[in-house]
Amino acid sequence: GISRIKLTGGEPLVRKGVEKLAEMLCQTPGIEQVTLTTNGVFLKEKLPVLQQAGVHSVNISLDTMDREQYQKLTGTDCLLQVMESIYAALEQGMQVKVNCVALKDQNESQWSKIAALAKSYPLDVRFIEMMPIGLGKSCLGSLQETVQKKLEAVYGEAKPEADLSAERGNGPAVYWEFPGFQGKIGFISAISHKFCADCNRIRMTAEGFVKPCLQFAKGVDMRALLRGQNEDIVLKEALKQLIYEKPRCHQFETEDEDESLEQ
């Protein structure tokens, strides 16, 4: 069954009642962990209530540590707030992961600076290959080998994570150890190291539509089923069928692509 839930977006912390939702999920029997992916802008002020709700792990998106470039990429001048949120989360004992999308010809100069956070602090930094869905179709991404080569030129040769039993996360990230780092460097490489065979996720949009894969629009409208006052067995069977029919793999490398739904 489903035992781990991640609240993501968009930006979940701008949604009214997200703290109460997190609390409800944490208190649901069978749910072992609820985590949050955020841009970090409002995280610092919401940390106490999130921790009280039962959220003890956050992923914070950060594609540059240059203030001017951050404003260009996001449209907001909020880099300081994001950095304060990272430090505050660490001080509160939360598990922190920083996510950086590797953008070709855009943030290459920032990769080593963002990676340095894992050297100076007990957090993990993950570099994510750009997936050609939604706005990602118009952006060029860099592959894991390119990022890793640049990081090793600065910090020395990396080695695969020694302790494979370490509880680092629930997803497809593969972690590497760099000399002298407190944290690990992870790579989420959907393009160069296709991990579909090990994918254990389904996704629910803000409208209650459940999808088995980010790329494809196919899914189940759970909100409609709930409003139809169906019995629990109907909902369970709908989810079971959705998971059973989960696509074998994405088709990012082809032009034959269904309409994706990235929310």
Q: Which stretches of residues belong to each language-model region?
A:
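Short, intrinsically disordered/low-complexity patches at protein termini
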Residues: N39, V234-L235, E259
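Accessory C-terminal segments flanking Radical SAM cores
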Residues: G134-Q251
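Short amphipathic alpha-helical patches
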Residues: P48, L73-T74, S112-K113, G141, ...
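Short, conserved beta-strand edge motifs with alternating hydrophobic and charged residues
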Residues: N99, R126-M130, E177, F187-I188
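Short flanking/linker segments adjacent to small metal-binding domains or redox-active Cys/His motifs
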Residues: R4, L242-Q263
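Radical SAM/AdoMet-radical enzyme domain recognition
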Residues: G1-L7, E11, R15-I128
